[in-house]
């Protein structure tokens, strides 16, 4: 390396500085490759005291590191030089624009990292991917979510040695770049979602390249969507580039999904005690988990003869009074009402959390986030309380509510159709498919999303501003319009009337939604059809069979109802034809037992997601040969392969 050339390029560094920096680079470039990974460079700089990890991380964004993400000697020297500029007061190169009358920033680093506010308002502002854009990271959310990951993944056989991650830096986002931590987090929230054997793992201490990391990111994003996470504008490159606000949002969605998954009357029959006097079980089951949590919270407040109620996870809990009563109800012996006598809100919040600690539930919240009314952290805290200390009397056998069990196929399809409708960004999101479609509004939104311009909203009865339900008569007008639209678009809707949707007829509702989803698939695949028309099931089947042959395999099926599909061999062979080498047949079992068939199906789903396919079904749908859902699996592969 030409020292003179480097000194001209980075005049802020003396010759002595340059020699020292080069030696430090060589100390971490043990194999003399001429480059190191970003993580190594950041750790080296922060260890030397040249900057904090986060300052070095933000500054590196302004150094011309190439697409490989590897830090070469020139880049490393550039990083050190920019950090030196920030300390000597040289004019920083920043991507931040501050309006003349905006709130003053408490501290601004020339690295482009801004700390704004403190205590309850502590936030970090980081540069966006576009010049002039910024994103805000809530420090307490980042810290608590990092603690959660450290806790649930501690001892993991694959990544446990990486933990714990520092809770006071942005290192978490760098650790998430290869998709492995996020995959493990998804499996913690919803076990068995990802077959980790399909993930790309580092070998011989070498980090994954960008392509391998992007495949892992595909699995993460598509799996998160499939378990019901709201994943908007997050792409594989966002993960591998460590974009903080997007990764933090994704982490929250995954944690939230896991925390709320146990708020289910089938798992907790004692939730039946939360029904109000004039409420039916069917109405109660329509509530989203957050509303059930609020109902649970208020049940305990009512049992305590407390005069307040909570309607949110922010201002209604921010003074700590309602939490004091709740914890006292859950365990009067351990959790006293003494915090009510404390007037200072921060002191009271600390006392509340000390009570929670006695229940081994001091998690997610800090005094400052409690007083600030952080809705995410308060929701997580209350969900954790419910999951560990529901405090409801067990239901006796004679009291047990009759929870209607409709046919397994209908339940499976309802789950997939709910996820699909929510992926269209319908508003409000669908919680209970058959109940939420009764007024026709979600159906009509879905028609418009799938076939823009199809719906004349002048003919649609909307809900009043209060959010109250519309009358049965108006709901019938909407659902009749939805059925008429379907017929006009060529759907087979023999015997289906609007009243069937309003009355919650499950079979007929599923039939209508399936045809709408099928049309959505067909529109996406039209470019694949030589005629430009909708593709029939037989054409889709022929395409799948051609892929099997192309991959040198000979499995066959007669239709999408063929029981031979149950062991997933055919689907794995289709994947092999699309992407040779992606199916490791050493991992494929004969499929003689239920466990083997499940393992094969999970393997097929994970490989499809790795390739970038959005797969809604779960392994049981394949094992039980749910024909419609298997068609969606093949159709996703077709759109991927076009």
Curated annotation (Swiss-Prot):
Single GO MF annotation: protein-macromolecule adaptor activity
Gene from which this protein is expressed: SAC6
Residues involved in Ca(2+) 1 binding: 29, 31, 35
Stated role: Binds to actin, and functionally associates with actin structures involved in the development and maintenance of cell polarity.
An individual GO BP term: actin filament network formation
Residue ranges of domain EF-hand in the record: 16-50, 51-86
Keyword Lipid biosynthesis: no
Note: Present with 3510 molecules/cell in log phase SD medium.
Binding site for Ca(2+) 2: 66, 68, 70, 75
Name used for this protein in its record: Fimbrin
Region (Actin-binding 1): 125-394
Segments of this protein annotated with the region Actin-binding 2: 395-642
